[in-house]
Design a protein with these regions (language model features):
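N-terminal secretory signal peptides that target proteins for export/translocation
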Residues: 1-11
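Active-site-adjacent loops and short helices of periplasmic peptidoglycan-processing enzymes
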Residues: 6, 30-203
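Sec-dependent N-terminal signal peptides of Gram-positive bacterial secreted proteins and lipoproteins
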Residues: 11-34
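Short, intrinsically disordered/low-complexity patches at protein termini
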Residues: 27, 84-87, 141, 146, ...
């Protein structure tokens, strides 16, 4: 009995040891997978708030407190620029008011009632970040600075930037009864996406922000001015193609910029990225985030041929068999390209959800929508396609009954 008991104990110990080995191996696999996913994520960013966005889809790939509301300094001017491009007339001019003249540095140094072409002032705005140029532009397009700020806030809401509030066209620290001049890194990236990807004036915006230097004069030609682009990131990384710097005492150093390489386009937005004497922090953070995007994300075609079900058409006419009581109609997914390329990490998986009517009432038109196919990533919708009918189905109405009976019994 003792020998039998001892043998059972040995077997039991072997089982426990084997079970423990399996559990340890499984845990190590989970740890390794997690480590592989996180080892390349940007760490120790200087910015208090940061976002890396896929500019094509608008999906945020990485963020550090990206939804925190903070002042954004002269990165404000990307909104000022794009609104002006979309609203100004060819050859339109603006006159410097006393308020414009009073703007603090950095400024162009305009004189009261001096007149400029708005196109020239946009280069002053974006290359040198001149605060007085921003006010001339705002008062010309919006009637007043307050009127222009209202346009800025309206556009922000259109773009889904619900945590953004504009008071000034130049980004100087400001506060009123509704709050402070502020945004989030996520909203700032959304505004930049609009400027470089979606606006009808995106080409002009890029032309201005990519210009190295620019010369112009006032309308009368009495004074000449020269502007130099201070966006050092343009020469810092291959593929960098647009951006805007900013600084105020409250906002600290801020930056929003874009890069395109290997068919991938990224936007980085940084808020509160150091204070003097740490002017270069924003470039270090921008490079780190851009390299993270380039090294970890690739386009993948996630399109799948979804087998949409045939749908019962109640009271429908079957051409092949008019007396058939059950008529089914073929369906398809309305995507002629048969392709859906999404910027993804290796481990990211897209889920597909099909929603389709089980039955519909006749008459049914060709290409009539009867459902959707939706692609999700981490619970968020990436893309949605309609499920439509392949052909039309007529209704068994009174006229159809009369015609059918006539053909059957009278002809």
């Amino acid at each position: 009995m003792r020998e039998m008991y001892g043998e059972k104990m040995k077997i039991w110990k072997r089982f426990i040891n084997m079970f423990m080995c399996i559990m340890i191996c499984a845990q190590m696999c989970v740890v390794n997978i997690y480590a592989e996913e996180t080892q390349n994520e940007p760490e120790e960013l200087y910015a208090r708030s940061a976002v890396l966005m896929d500019a094509d889809s608008g999906r945020i790939l990485f963020q550090k407190d990206g939804e925190n509301v903070m002042p954004m300094a002269s990165t404000t001017k990307i909104m000022t620029c794009i609104l002006t491009l979309e609203n100004m007339e060819d050859g339109q001019t603006g006159m410097a008011s006393d308020y414009a003249v009073s703007q603090p540095k950095v400024h162009l140094g305009v004189r009261s009632k001096e007149e400029f072409y708005l196109e020239d002032l946009l280069y002053s705005l974006m290359l040198e970040s001149h605060n007085d140029s921003a006010v001339i532009i705002a008062e010309t397009i919006g009637g007043t600075v307050e009127g222009f700020a209202a346009l800025m806030n309206e556009k922000a809401k259109e773009l889904g930037c619900n945590d953004t509030y504009f008071i000034t066209p130049n980004g100087l620290d400001a506060e009123d009864e509704n709050g402070i001049h502020s945004t989030t890194a996520a909203d700032l990236a959304r505004i930049m996406k609009y400027c470089i990807m979606d606006s009808p004036e995106k080409d002009e915006f890029l032309k201005i922000t990519q210009t190295k230097s620019y010369q112009f004069s006032d309308v009368k030609g009495e004074r000449s001015f020269s502007c130099t682009n201070h966006n050092a990131f343009l020469d810092m990384m291959e593929g960098a193609f647009s951006g805007k710097t900013g600084f105020t005492a409250n906002a600290g150093y801020c930056y929003v910029g874009a890069l395109e390489r290997d068919g991938k386009t990224f936007i980085v937005a940084l808020l509160a990225c150091g204070w003097p004497n740490n002017k270069t922090y924003k470039w270090k953070d921008t490079r780190k985030l851009m390299e993270y995007g380039l090294n970890n994300y690739e386009y993948r075609n996630v399109w799948e041929e979804v087998k949409s079900k045939n749908v019962l058409v109640e009271n429908g006419v079957d051409k092949a068999n008019p007396y058939n009581s059950e008529v089914y109609i073929h369906t398809k997914v309305a995507n002629e390209d048969k392709e859906l390329s999404i910027l993804l990490k290796k481990s990211e998986k897209v889920e597909i959800q099909v929603e389709q009517d089980e039955k519909i009432e006749a008459p049914v038109a060709k290409n009539e929508k009867i459902g959707t196919v939706t692609y999700f990533l981490d619970g968020k919708m990436l893309k949605q396609y309609d499920v439509v009918t392949v052909n039309a189905v007529k209704e068994k109405d009174l006229l159809w009954c009369i015609n059918t009976l006539s053909r059957e019994y009278l002809l």
